[in-house]
Design a protein with these regions (language model features):
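Glycine-rich beta-strand-centered segment in the early N-terminal region that forms part
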Residues: 5-21, 31-93
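Conserved beta-strand elements of the Class I
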Residues: 13, 169-170
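NAD(P)H dinucleotide-binding glycine-rich loop of Rossmann-like/cofactor-binding domains
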Residues: 52-53, 64-67, 76, 86-166
Length: 171
């Protein structure tokens, strides 16, 4: 099973997937290829994930992000997450091991937002944001999925802090 195959080890975190958000370039390419036929888009996305073990569009190279619930945390994970945390990943799905268990059956293939069930694995170098209980998945996707900006801000701030300098961040 996907759960057994994706047991968290060492510095990994296993996440129960609730929703994928395909990046705009990937979705547009698939939509155009299949002339808006949602069933064909859904079948291709499911096929990409099944064959590659991640959502990495073979034409655009891009993926997206996901929202899920932490199922298991490896004993050496540096991510600061706990089982039960609702999270959004801030690294591309093109870099995230992923198994889908529902065939994306609840998705009509006509938008970037994909209801899904499955399992993903985050590594020690992954970036994930714990989501507040009062933040809807839809709003979280809109706020968090801005071309990797949250991950870039985190990295830049850490570089400044590591050098003993106070960063200035404008939001």
């Amino acid at each position: 099973s996907a759960e057994r195959r994706f047991a968290a080890i060492s510095n990994e975190v296993r996440v129960r997937v609730r929703r994928l958000n395909l990046d705009a370039a990937s979705f547009q390419q698939l939509h155009d290829k299949h002339v808006g036929d949602g069933a064909r888009v859904r079948a291709e996305v499911a096929g990409i994930i099944a064959s590659r073990g991640k959502m990495q569009n073979p034409v655009t190279g891009s993926g997206g992000m996901l929202i899920g619930t932490v199922a298991e945390v490896g004993p050496q994970s540096p991510l600061g997450l706990s089982a039960g945390d609702r999270v959004a990943t801030l690294v591309s799905l093109s870099l995230t091991p992923l198994v889908i268990t529902d065939g994306l059956e609840r998705w009509d293939g006509r938008s970037e937002r994909v209801p899904a069930a499955g399992t993903a694995v985050l590594f020690g170098r992954s970036i994930a944001a714990r989501l507040p209980d009062d933040l809807s998945p839809e709003l979280a996707l809109m706020v968090m999925d801005v071309c990797g900006a949250p991950a870039l801000v985190t990295r830049v701030v850490q570089e400044y802090a590591g050098a003993g300098r106070a960063p200035t961040v404008a939001v």
